[in-house]
A protein has these predicted regions:
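Transmembrane beta-strands of outer-membrane beta-barrel pores
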Residues: 141, 170-174, 196, 205-209, ...
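Post-signal-peptide, soluble extracytosolic/periplasmic N-terminal scaffold domains
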Residues: 2, 6-12, 19-271, 580-653, ...
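Short, ordered, surface-exposed loop/turn motifs in non-cytosolic proteins
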Residues: 49-72, 678-688, 758-772
Length: 829
């Protein structure tokens, strides 16, 4: 393939297009017939023929835009052509305003629409091999110089699309005595994209069949809204029924609009906080995180400690966590999500404005209630290390609230913020009530000791303070005595000791009320990795958890485990769990992780309670497929019950280019549709996605407003499939569905020497084109050597070889082709 690579290199040209004609020295080619070389297209240095091209745009060493239309236009009075750099191209580059205003039109182009960007410091390069246009621009010209930051001019809103994300769970409980019961849960998001606008509707469905012919079902839409990015304002506009997400005020459901700064449009260094939720499951259990009845996250976990992934930064307030065990028992508690101090850069302002009417009466009630309200909040970087923030809720009714705070970066001492909020409310029957709420946040990372401490969201509210949700609740109960929050705080601490291969984590959360018992949660975990003789990579951990519930009662749990590697990506573990209710569980577990796409485990244990003891057996399997993720688990306690759980997570996306099922997507993060024509089985991003029978596949496009590199897994391509490009780079806005057509061919491949009727070879650079489809199958190299791909049965008799601008002969291929045969003799007549 050396000659083929040489032929490709010969096609490289540059966009400094005004040059003298050059005749190539054909003697440099290792060819037996030097006169038999057709290089007329390359006779002028840097030559690119005038016309319209579809090229990938690059800036320095970074991709900017893919498959962008580019014009190459002739210059009047000169035997030359130039690449037309338009104002739209310049806008994509993120140049400083003074540089843009200084650009002049290219002389000799009549319409004046082509700008001269070439100078002693900048270049415009064209690569025919890669179909790429590269701008070499000095950093001093650039408005943005953060290597992890892509300016808004390079963001894409994607294509018009419909989507449906879903999470389906089903479980069956079969007691030894009593009726079998089934439960089902389905939740997700449906949406539609048009330009920069996104329509979204969250949905939830649940059903419980008791086994006695009775069933309960429920379906509702917690929020339906329309949103779009406003890059010029670094903001997001939302319209419809949604939840207020505020760093200052408590969250509540309302119908209206919100205009807010979006941190994700800022550099990565300015990112907020998202809570971690942890606990201990007694069996194969279903964990649900919700807020005001809306499911935020739901999954099934194995017995033992669990930690859920970070939730969205846009979530604020208290979260409800419930664990439903395989025997049907349920435990619930609350987690506070107050954010750590956020420091704005000096002179920077971040804001949020919301207006509308509250929705109250549960997630099923989409009727608004008074009063109409207007909310505003802002953070201002007053000084280098000091930020001021505040907010106001003004209503046409009987509720007003105002807050004022300060955030301070104390350097080595960490970051601290403090604020005070006042509320004024007139309750039913004319009772007026005013009160104050005080809050302190603190966070500190100790780099030298590997420690992180966050004293997150300590808040104290006096007896007369009412948040907006509490006020709405009082109105709904005609001034009745609803739960009235008094104090809440969350403390998290983590410690890493690399020398000892140990780590520790502590989490404390407390929420109490003026008129109810407190809700407290404590979690401590210790982990160590060690060796024992010839056994390497052993690990041991111990966890302590205590939950005190608002309705009374508490549960203490201790969990300890030791894991021993068992071959490659397999392990055996022993665990023991004890609680304050007399329960003691001992379990031996075997886990298999050698296939990253399908993992499974089985376990056997003995359970002892105050009322007796029993044995238990359980197992689970999780499989990640290109079109979704599946999981199943089963539990057996002889003489007690059997249970079975199933789950399926996935998405379906449809555009004018096709539709495809895919793995579950995260919230409103963007996704990318890959189109390979009719070529199926093309793997993308490992096993994240594979094109379906129609040549369409969908994969996650990473994070909004961040460049995502999506690659075709060339090593895993089917033997008869070839692709022209394997990496896709694009920056998509929130919720966007990107689209990229990949030139893929499916068919036979052959390597051979093409011979004419007189025994000679076609000239170097001649093209082999399918007479059936018009697709280029390959290019002729030295001595007639050609590598032809994507050949169909019809191509065996319809491949044309062209040079000098016309078809010269037609190839005749053997009936059976295989690349392993080596170079074949390919007659051309």
């Amino acid at each position: 393939m050396k000659i083929t690579r040489l032929a490709i290199l010969m096609t490289l040209t540059f966009s400094v297009l005004k040059s003298q004609a050059t005749e190539f020295n054909a003697s440099l080619l290792d060819s037996g017939n030097l006169s038999n070389v057709d290089l007329t297209a390359f006779s002028r240095e840097g030559y690119v023929a005038p016309g319209n091209y579809i090229l990938d745009i690059w800036l320095n060493d970074q991709p900017v835009r893919e498959q962008y239309p580019v014009r190459v236009v002739p210059v009047a009075g000169l035997d030359a052509a130039v690449i037309c750099v338009t104002t739209d191209m310049v806008a994509m580059l993120g140049l400083k305003d003074k540089i843009i205003h200084g650009l002049k039109p290219v002389t000799g182009i009549p319409d004046g629409q082509c700008l001269e960007l070439r100078s002693a410091d900048s270049q415009v390069r064209y690569s025919a091999e890669n179909q790429r246009l590269t701008f070499i621009i000095p950093q001093a010209w650039m408005r943005y110089q953060d290597p992890d930051w892509v300016p808004p001019s390079r963001w894409s809103d994607g294509v018009t699309a419909g989507l449906l994300d879903y999470s389906l769970m089903a479980s069956r409980y079969m007691p030894q005595q009593g009726e079998t019961s089934d439960s089902y849960s389905l939740y997700g998001t449906a949406g539609f994209n048009l330009g920069a606008w996104r329509l979204r509707s969250d949905y939830q469905y649940s059903r419980f069949d008791s086994g006695r012919g009775a069933s309960q079902s429920d379906f509702y839409l917690p929020q339906t809204y329309l949103f779009r990015a406003l890059p010029a304002l670094r903001s997001k506009l939302t319209l419809g029924q949604t939840y207020l997400s505020s760093a200052i005020f408590d969250s509540f459901r309302f119908a209206g609009l919100t205009l807010a700064s979006d941190e994700r449009m800022l550099p990565p260094s300015l990112q907020g906080y998202a809570p971690k939720i942890s606990g201990i499951a007694n069996s194969n259990a279903q964990v649900t995180v919700s807020q005001n009845g809306r499911i935020l996250y739901q999954t099934r976990v194995s017995p033992g400690p669990f930690e859920l992934p970070d939730l969205s930064q846009n979530i604020s307030g208290n979260l409800d966590v419930s664990v439903r065990e395989s025997d049907g028992s349920v435990r619930t508690w609350q987690v506070n999500t107050a954010s750590v101090p956020f420091m704005a850069r000096q002179g920077q302002v971040r804001y949020k404005v919301a207006a509308g009417r509250p929705l109250y009466g549960g997630t099923h009630n989409n009727s608004t209630v008074s009063p109409d309200f207007l909310l505003g909040e802002a953070t201002w970087g007053a000084f280098n290390n000091t930020s001021l923030y505040g907010g106001l809720i003004a209503s046409t009714g009987d509720y007003q609230s105002a807050a004022l705070g300060i955030g301070q970066n104390m350097g080595l001492l960490g970051a601290l913020s403090a604020d005070v909020t006042r509320s004024d409310a007139r309750l039913p029957h004319g009772q007026k009530q005013s009160g104050y709420s005080y809050r302190i946040n603190y966070a500190k990372t100790f780099d030298k000791t590997g420690s992180t401490l966050a004293f997150v969201g300590y808040r104290f509210s006096d007896r007369h303070f009412l948040s907006m949700p509490e006020y709405l609740q009082r109105r709904a109960t005609d001034g009745g005595d609803a739960w009235h929050e008094k104090q809440s705080y969350t403390v998290t601490y983590s410690q890493s000791v690399p020398v000892l291969n140990m780590s520790a984590a502590l989490s404390i959360s407390r929420l109490n009320y003026w008129n109810a018992q407190s809700n407290n949660n404590y979690m401590l975990s210790l982990n160590k990795v060690f060796s024992l003789g010839d056994l390497q990579g052993l690990s041991a951990s111990v966890s302590f958890a205590r939950n005190q519930y608002t309705g009374g009662g508490s549960q203490n749990q201790v969990y300890a485990t030791i894991s021993i590697p068992w071959g490659d990506s397999r392990q055996v573990s022993y665990s023991v769990q004890k609680d304050n209710r007399g329960g003691l569980q001992q379990t031996v577990n075997y886990s298999d992780f050698h296939n990253p796409d399908t993992t499974w485990n089985i376990s056997a244990g003995h359970n002892r309670y105050d009322t007796g003891s029993n044995s238990s057996f359980s197992g689970s399997v999780q499989s990640r497929l290109p079109w979704g993720q599946a999981a199943a688990d089963a539990t057996l306690q002889p003489g007690q019950y059997r249970s079975l759980g199933l789950s399926w997570y996935g998405s379906v996306t449809a555009t004018a280019h096709g539709a495809a099922f895919s793995q579950s997507m995260a919230g409103n993060e963007p996704r990318m549709m890959i189109d390979t024509g009719d070529v199926a089985g093309v793997p993308v991003n490992g096993n994240s996605g594979v094109t379906n029978r129609f040549g369409v596949g969908v994969v996650s496009a990473g994070s909004s407003y961040r460049r995502s590199d999506i690659s075709v897994d060339v090593a895993a391509l089917p033997e008869d499939v070839d692709v022209s490009s394997s990496v896709i780079s694009q920056v998509l806005t929130e919720g966007a569905v990107g689209y990229r057509k990949i030139d893929a061919s499916q068919g036979e491949q052959v390597l051979g020497h093409i011979r004419l009727a007189d025994g000679a070879s076609p000239p170097f650079g001649a093209m082999v084109v399918s007479g059936t489809t018009g697709r280029t199958a390959g290019m002729v190299g030295d001595d007639g050597l050609a590598y032809l791909t994507g050949l169909s049965k019809e191509d065996h008799r319809t491949l044309n070889v062209s040079w000098d601008g016309r078809v010269q002969c037609r190839l005749s291929l053997p009936e059976i082709l295989t690349i392993s045969q080596g170079p074949l003799l390919l007659p051309c007549k």
